[in-house]
Amino acid sequence: MRNIIIFIVFCCAVGCGAVFSFYYYGDDWLAVPELSATDDADDVAVVQQPEKKLYGKQVVDGETYYYDSNGEKMTGIQMIGEKYYYFAADGVMLKNRRVTITFDGIPVPCFINDEGELGFITTVSQEAAVSGHDEAVPPALERNKDFNINDVQRGIETIMARYGGKTAVYFNDLKTNQQISLNNMPMYPCCMIKTAALSTFMHRVEEGSIDYAQYQSYIGPMIIYSDNTCYNRLMKGLGDGDALLGAKRLNEYCNAIGMRETAAYHGLRPGADYFTGGNSSNVSSANDIGHYFEKLYYGQLANVPHTQEMLNLYAQCDDREGIAGGLPANVGYAHKTGEAYAFYHDGGIVYAEGRPYIVVAFTDGVQNNRAFLKELSSYLYHYQMTTIL
């Protein structure tokens, strides 16, 4: 506790000392009547200022701490705003590292970026996700230049220019949160709509509106093998037996989490239990899917066990002809693809060592669309692994 010299307004009386009207302190000379005097003289009083409790973010010697409403340092896993952070036993916020954190007795691998934001990593090994993949693991790349988001954009634009048709690309470097959005437009999403179906299901499970065990058998095939019947039946479950009501609830959920270019209006074929309610087509965009995977990565769509479950399903997606084809065999990729007519889309989280990022590409009428996605993916991975932040 620090002493403060303050001037007072006083009067004198026989047998009495100074009578204090109020105290002044600080650069603004604020009147603070609640301070208590510990010594008095004719015109000066020495008082003690009550020690103030720290609250919120504090930076000391370059280290970040957070204090709760009781003035205590936060430790362990904490949600601040809409993102998770992790604080060591001494209260220091951890940054820029991989860690394994235990949630309710379950060890969960995570990556912490330069801002201390914690992102979740799939626990499915790449070897398990890529059964039979015999590509040699390349040697480590040398980091020899500074990261520049404008360079990334120019590289993407150069690749896009070599292919015809319509392409939309979204990119986010998860360590810096620097983003690129090129040619974003609503498109028919094909099976990418299943991302929203999965998260709507988990959301309704957590709010107690649907029985997880009753529909659990649908979500794996829907994501891993893109089974349309499972999607159609899950939508029916989301609507308490009415698939169109399920679609309405999906749309409400998408709007609530900011996916305002995404909506479902019908089922998917080929598959049983197809449904439709009019002439509108399902719709989404590269930006929406990119933001979806960002929220999933940061644990903003579901609780920790369900977040981990969804990431593990996406890591096992069996279509690896697009973006996955441009990645080394040992690099994790949690994603979803969609294909129908002239459309082919792919997007998700690339777990490049120390430099995770999100990439989503929507294509319409692009010849050699898989070659485009593979080239795009190879370029982004190589850039991430050879640049310094």
Q: Positions of the model-derived regions?
A:
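Extracellular adhesion/carbohydrate-binding repeat motifs centered on closely spaced tryptophans
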Residues: R2-D134
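Structured C-terminal helix/loop/strand segments within mature extracytoplasmic catalytic/sensor domains
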Residues: G15, Y23-D28, D39-D40, G132-E157, ...
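Soluble periplasmic/extracytoplasmic beta-strand elements of cell-envelope proteins
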Residues: Y66, F111, A168-N172, A196, ...
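Short, conserved catalytic-motif segment at the N-terminal edge
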Residues: G164-P186
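Active-site-proximal beta-strand/loop segments in catalytic clefts of secreted hydrolases
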Residues: N172-L174, M222-D227, L234-L238, H266-R269, ...
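Active-site SXXK
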Residues: N177, P186-I210, P221-M222, V359
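Active-site-proximal loop and beta-strand segments within enzyme catalytic domains
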Residues: M202-S226, K248, A256-M259
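Mid-domain, small-residue-enriched loop/turn segments at the edges of structured enzyme/sensor domains
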Residues: M235-Y298
